[in-house]
Amino acid sequence: MSKIIGIDLGTTNSCVAVLEGGEPKVIPNPEGSRTTPSVVAFKNGERLVAKRQAITNPNTIISIKRHMGTDYKVEIEGKKYTPQEISAIILQYLKSYAEDYLGEPVTRAVITVPAYFNDAQRQATKDAGRIAGLQVERIINEPTAAALAYGLDKEEDQTILVYDLGGGTFDVSILELGDGVFEVKATAGDNHLGGDDFDQVIIDYLVEQFKQEHGIDLSKDKMALQRLKDAAEKAKKELSGVTQTQISLPFISANETGPLHIETTLTRAKFEELSAHLVERTMGPVRQALQDAGLTPADIDKVILVGGSTRIPAVQEAIKRELGKEPHKGVNPDEVVAIGAAIQGGVIAGEVKDVVLLDVTPLSLGIETMGGVFTKLIERNTTIPTSKSQIFTTAADNQTTVDIHVLQGERPMAADNKTLGRFQLTDIPPAPRGVPQIEVTFDIDANGIVHVRAKDLGTNKEQSITIKSSSGLSEEEIQRMIKEAEENAEADRKRKEAAELRNEADHLVFTTEKTLKEVEGKVDEAEVKKAREAKDALKAALEKNDIDDIRKKKEALQEIVQQLSVKLYEQAAKQAQAQQQTGAGDAAKKDDNVVDAEFEEVKDDNK
């Protein structure tokens, strides 16, 4: 059975890990990095993952995770792509280098999502996995995964708060750990708050400064904006270690007097002033989670930081102020989520024993009832998997159909919450209002995905749906995307093989030239000429870039070079033999002058 890999599919960076010999291990990408940028670019029909070329290539997609579970589509080279398809391209890349590392096909994965992801976003993530050719064994919340990674080897019982500030999402979860049980007590968050927003405040500041100074709005210039984004991200990272940084962007724009540049110093104090409202926004969910769990800051034993943005000093200071304790720095915030996902994979595969994970649903679930009211059936922070039923009735006399409008959220009115789906229960026997009894049952599985069924208790007629949001994909669409992804994977494989073949052919040309110099005058000139012609033919094929021709010419040259090498060795062996014979003759001549003598051992008895 294939290994189950753990994937942290992040807004800005992704990471993949696997359990090896009971130990979780992060798999580095082909460039040797332990995290991979969640960036997809298209160039002349070719898909490039993790190449940060947004400056030069307008067909570059970043932070697609922010659009998961929506009907957003991005048009590239005349084709529209859903967020699921773009995410699948990233997942395919992670899968491919995990396969190279493990030396076997990978078909199963545990993928993490922000704890505050709703049903549509979770379903979209699962679909992305399927499109990438992965059986998604479990969707697991990022803070829960981090807690798994942190707490696996901890003996004592403790209550931990996981503060997860990623590139585009923010979550807080409070868990109780003890005897291998990881129980989530409460979770809260904001799906539109992350490191990208901290970059944005620096960008806005630089744009405003430049506008005041030169009267030019850089936010209208796509290439300038991308350069600003890169500079802002770099400045943000540098300010985690130093108190001021230099932002230098030459030739960012031009006016009638000539080129214009940005040359400015950004201090940590200024950055903290610009981002203070964002840091404060993260404190709301922290307080909410504590309240929902019925705890005070004093009840928290450890604060675990997850996500690259938690390196920002102001963030760490705010946590310290709010919770009265130093955050724990013993985990790598970029890798801990993927490691936790790999551990959960090990739990599912039976490799990790005595670990029980009890997660919760982040948002309340219910249906719309008379007057547009949102009636909750499952409250937020209920442990999953779970099932809950409630009996409803008709609102009008002789009503024969009931519309079931399924929602997720916390607001009292249905219109203010997120619609997950609608379905109808039909053929209800006509009766006065309030007489029919309709039982609505909600099931939430371990992935946090919702299934709903409605049953008329009078006729036992039942109607059920697995929620498909308006942005959800139909089975036909998923199958089509899987097929396209496989075709692209095949095209990528062929491209990779072609690149490897060209490299091998180049190397063979180089070594042949070297060999020909060595054999000159040592083997028959006709053989050398034959090899030289074959080498030139391969060079010509390389210039034409005809893969089949390169393969043929390479094989032909390899054979000739092998024959040359054999002849060279034969020649060398003959020479060595001739030298040995000459040496043996000389030794025999020397032996003629040797006189044999007898000797006698004399014993000295006086000693």
Swiss-Prot record:
Domain of life: Bacteria
Ranges where the record places region Disordered: 571-607
Keyword hit for Chaperone: yes
Compositionally biased intervals (Low complexity): 571-586
Induction / repression: By stress conditions e.g. heat shock.
UniProt entry keywords in alphabetical sequence: ATP-binding, Chaperone, Nucleotide-binding, Phosphoprotein, Stress response
Alphabetical list of Pfam families matching this protein: HSP70
InterPro entries: ATPase_NBD, Chaperone_DnaK, Heat_shock_70_CS, HSP70_C_sf, HSP70_peptide-bd_sf, Hsp_70_fam
Positions of post-translational Phosphothreonine modification: T169
Acidic residues composition-biased segments: 594-607
MF annotations from Gene Ontology: ATP binding; ATP-dependent protein folding chaperone; unfolded protein binding
Residue ranges the record marks as coiled coil: none
Family statement drawn from the similarity comment of this UniProt entry: Belongs to the heat shock protein 70 family.
Function: Acts as a chaperone.
Protein name (Swiss-Prot/TrEMBL): Chaperone protein DnaK
Organism per entry: Parageobacillus thermoglucosidasius
GN (gene name): dnaK
